[in-house]
Amino acid sequence: MKFFTTGLLATAALAAAQEQQVLQAEDGMGRAPLPDSSIFDETLQKFQSSLEDGISHFWSEMKTNFKDYLPLISLPKKHTRRPDSEWDHVVRGADIESVWVQGADGEKRREIDGKLHNYDLRVKAVDPGVKQYSGYLDDNDADKHLFYWFFESRNDPKNDPVVLWLNGGPGCSSLTGLFLELGPATIDKNLKVVSNPYSWNSNASVIFLDQPVNVGFSYSGSSVSDTVAAGKDVYALLTLFFKQFPEYATQDFHISGESYAGHYIPVFAAEILSHKNTNINLKSALIGNGLTDPLTQYPQYRPMACGEGGYPAVLDQGTCRSMDNSLERCLSLIETCYSSESAWVCVPAAMYCNSAILAPYQQTGMNPYDVRTKCEDMASLCYPQLNAITEWLNQKPVMQALGVEVESYESCNSGINRDFLFHGDWMKPYHRLVPSVLEKIPVLIYAGDADFICNWLGNKAWTEALEWPGHKKFAETKLEDLKIVDNKNKGKKIGQVKSSGNFTFMRIFGAGHMVPLNQPEASLEFLNRWLRGEWH
């Protein structure tokens, strides 16, 4: 779903460490201590001596305030694996890996690249009324099982493109994106399924993937705690899926997502593009309200919260000045993280910056995903409709129809969010992969302009600052009006757009963090035009 601030900001507030321990005890997450908590002390002592004073002091604070918190791990989800006989198809990665062909140079090579022998794909037809499949990608060596749900295009599935959708968090299920934003249906307060006329599968087939493991209906006996580790799983999923359904493999493929997918997508796209012989016809990448380059994006939080992003100020002048005063240290920590990419410096950067720069907004009670509204229900990430979606997905008949193997569904897993944070993933410079991606495919960065947490000012700033061969021309290109051209509202302004070479940025008017939720017509409009090749 979205950039998962709840657990992060609670963790970031060092002054409220004791309260945080109480909150974590009450959140229902199963946790178990490491065999020997003294390991943390010993490891910390070894590394502290080599760290600069500010960072060393931070880890001393962490040791005091989070002594019992840091060494905790999430327990695996309870699950029951269904026998292969209950699935309509089982695709073996080992079978794909064993196929060799003769190349144009006369040399033998594998038909499809990549380490696939440890993966299987299980497939189940869900509903004959709407062609859809669900199932699991299994990494048998690592005991990882990723849940996916595929919906065929409503229009022309034999020719329409295929889109992969990824929610962020990290730790939020893509099924919230399915039912809250852009899927073929939503769930009302009476748990009734309601059709969505603006679904992204209007002119494309769409795959929703719960990743990393232990998110949504996915599960594992282990965990994934950084973005890079998840990339190979996504490559395997797509390879095995298109092998089972070659009719979709010939179509254009696009990878899309929002929020922390600003981390995921550069890595996943680079992983796919690194393989020469593949059945994935990757044509573009789309990131909505993403976090991609923290060093460039964090300076834009104060302007967005203080009335310079097109909406009234949420914070008072004193708080805005305090954020300005904290920014220099925040950026210094991020720069150190960018230089080393070590958790020992990237974690302090995330903890300090989120406490000093993000927490003041969070403490107002306003919705961090939409500066225009109060947060109605923090437990449901400010969107009470999530409660109905979660309740519907937890119904036994629904889980049975989908082939689900876990006992329950939750929209976001705070343990995953914490794991990524404490492995230093949050502040890492994944934007550095974007230039190599731009060499091969177009990239669209779009942003609802009412979002605070991954705001349009920050996304515009990092796209204009990115160093790539087309940097100067893109940075100098002015924003132009983005208008509807595809329906009866032709001529209606829905935002602004700038594009040069393979790079495009869009500001979408009147949308928060989740553009398809707030502006469904505009969302489908720009998606359809992007998939047709406009702006690239």
UniProtKB/Swiss-Prot annotation:
It is an enzyme of class 3 (hydrolase). It is found in: Vacuole. InterPro entries: AB_hydrolase_fold, Peptidase_S10, Ser_caboxypep_ser_AS. Pfam families: Peptidase_S10 (PF00450). Glycans are attached at N203, N502. Residues 1-17 form the signal peptide. Disulfide bonds join C172-C412, C306-C320, C330-C353, C337-C346, C375-C382. Its EC number is 3.4.16.5. Belongs to the peptidase S10 family. This is Carboxypeptidase Y homolog A. It comes from Trichophyton rubrum. The gene is cpyA.
